[in-house]
């Protein structure tokens, strides 16, 4: 293994992490509630532990409240990954990417799932409930599990993005 000490640390703390090493954090707003219930079912069927951060009822709510709780679990080290859902996936994605250390990606098919992991080392997967159903999520989840971060030129891109987290306008 070659690279800088920072690249080695990134490799050890992000690339070697696998689904199932720690519980997944899951969350949704009201528009993603049914999808979250499908996600729970898929995780249960695959014997994957998870912590559900809500919402727990299909009633109007703000995804920010649930995303913040799920992100807190990752930042504390309780969980390594988050799967979140809202109607388009964009809302939970934007909310997730506001937090330091979170690399959120909208995932709606196997291709976006594969490259969210391989090229972006995503740790937050935003699922659009309008376009993903339980059956397609099963395949997406298998794809997430089967892939790892490629490193190389992609770590440079991620490092540049992470450096932006400390920039003030």
State what each model feature region is:
Residues 25-48:
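Glycine-rich phosphate/diphosphate-binding loop of Rossmann-like nucleotide-binding domains
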Residues 46, 99-100, 120:
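Short, structured coil segments at secondary-structure junctions
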Residues 1-18:
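Conserved alpha/beta core of the MobA/IspD/sugar-nucleotide pyrophosphorylase nucleotidyltransferase superfamily
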């Amino acid at each position: 293994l070659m690279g800088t000490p920072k690249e080695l640390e990134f490799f050890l703390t992000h690339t070697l992490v696998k689904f199932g090493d720690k519980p997944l954090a899951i969350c949704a707003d009201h528009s993603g509630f049914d999808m979250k219930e499908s996600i729970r079912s898929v995780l249960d069927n695959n014997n994957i532990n998870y912590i559900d951060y809500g919402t727990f009822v299909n009633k109007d709510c703000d995804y920010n409240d649930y995303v913040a709780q799920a992100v807190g679990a990752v930042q504390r080290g309780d969980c390594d990954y988050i799967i979140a859902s809202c109607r388009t996936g964009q809302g939970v994605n934007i909310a997730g990417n506001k937090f330091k250390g979170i690399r959120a990606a909208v995932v709606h098919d196997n291709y976006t799932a594969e490259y969210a992991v391989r090229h972006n080392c995503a740790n937050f997967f935003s699922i659009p409930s309008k376009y993903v159903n339980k059956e397609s999520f099963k395949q997406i989840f298998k794809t997430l599990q089967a892939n790892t971060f490629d490193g190389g030129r992609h770590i440079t891109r991620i490092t540049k993005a992470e450096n932006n987290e400390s920039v003030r306008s």
